Amino acid sequence: CSSDLAVAVYLDAWHRDLPEFLQLRTNNGDDRMKAHDVFPAVCYPDLFWRLAEENIDAPWHLMCPHEILTVKGYALEDYWGTEWEKRYLDCVNDPRIEKRSVTVKDIVRLVLRSAVETGTPFAFNRDSVNHMNPNGHTGMIYCSNLCTEIAQNMAPIEHISTEVHTENGDTIVVTATRPGEFVVCNLASLSLGNLPVEDEAYMERTVETAIRALDNVIDLNFYPLEYARLTNQKYRSIGLGVSGYHHMLAKRGIHWESDEHLAFTDAVFELINYAAVKADTALAREKGRYALFEGSDWQTGAYFEKRDYTSEKWRALAKTVAVQGMRNAYLLAVAPTSSTSILSGTSAGIDPIMKKFFLEEKKGSMLPRVAPELSMDTWWYYKAAHLIDQSWSVRAAGLRQRHIDQAQSMNLYITNDYSMRQVLRLYLEAWRAGVKTIYYVRSKALEVEACESCSS
């Protein structure tokens, strides 16, 4: 996935070139081996995190995927979960496949060193993603996008044939391809800081409007690539997200580092998800279901079972979905909204604010930023991102993730007093909580600063 001359490249945690890949953006080493406009991301299987938690000195074997395909006749990257683990161990035990053996600790050190120094690699927990994929019956999710919030089925474009013709003296080469699955982001965000999130009826109407608008985008959009149009019309995937998360908490007098925060976010995102599913199945009744609905987790009810939606209203909605279908294959994805949140006068995405007031550089311009609706009533609820205990952010992300069928752009904010062990603990906590992706690790040197309250 690319944007503004940058590209995100995802590599499996067992890939032979992983150590070099993890040093693409670091400041030391051979500059000829650097790619500073590449944003590296790593796809982790559950096995890696289990070993990091239980036996970090365990061996970890890096292999060439092409060699595996040649020797074993299958692509290891085409599997996930227990089937992947079985085939991984099969490859490890096959003497015909060359291994670059290190320890889990070696890889963890490289990952964390790069994360602290450069903010990357992004983390993609592939087994968690695919276990919760509502459309696993038709494919697999291999990676995410540049902002780590998209999680949709992917498949490569396949070459079928090439024919050479001569017409009127001109040579024409005709290439036939199978289109694969070319993921497109159709995104919008709810400005939580400006919405009465406690009003269930109001939220349902708002979400219904957003879902309908995003569905219309699919039909009205211009597609420069035919592959994108075909995939978009087959899955009709959308990504409704949020902005103004910290704004929402501060307006209600909720501290970020509190159990009240966790309970509130769980309730809000369950409401958003319920409203989205309800609106989408109604849209399916009106306009028709997406082409691959049959056999999906939506149709079988597995979507609701995996998320432990057992209340009477959820059970009733699951029955309605099974009968009416769904208009869109994927519904929710929380993007960063770092620019659009400025226009909306709210905080970015699901992030805590950087400071109560600061200067931010955007496209070469310095913009003064003030926490939204900053007043004596909200002042003490706007704690700066780098001062927040990140375990609260991770726990909140885990609660939100249950209600988000795709992923969320979730950043970690650390200072230089964090040890590598503490950062690893955050990754492990996120994995255990079911968080699908981690975006940037935003580090900041500790500075001796005057108290904002006093200096103001």
What are these language model-derived features?
Residues 11-14, 21, 63, 124-127, ...:
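Generic beta-strand/beta-sheet core signal
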Residues 9-17, 42-43, 65-73, 125-137, ...:
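A glycine-rich phosphate-binding loop feature that marks nucleotide/adenosyl-phosphate handling sites
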Residues 1-189, 196-197, 223-227, 276, ...:
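Active-site cavity-forming subdomains of large catalytic enzyme subunits
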Residues 13-17, 211-219, 231-253:
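Core structural elements
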Residues 1-7, 179-184, 197-222, 277-281, ...:
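A structural-propensity feature for long, helix-poor, extended segments
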Residues 148-152, 214, 218-219, 303, ...:
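Catalytic alpha/beta core of large soluble enzyme barrels
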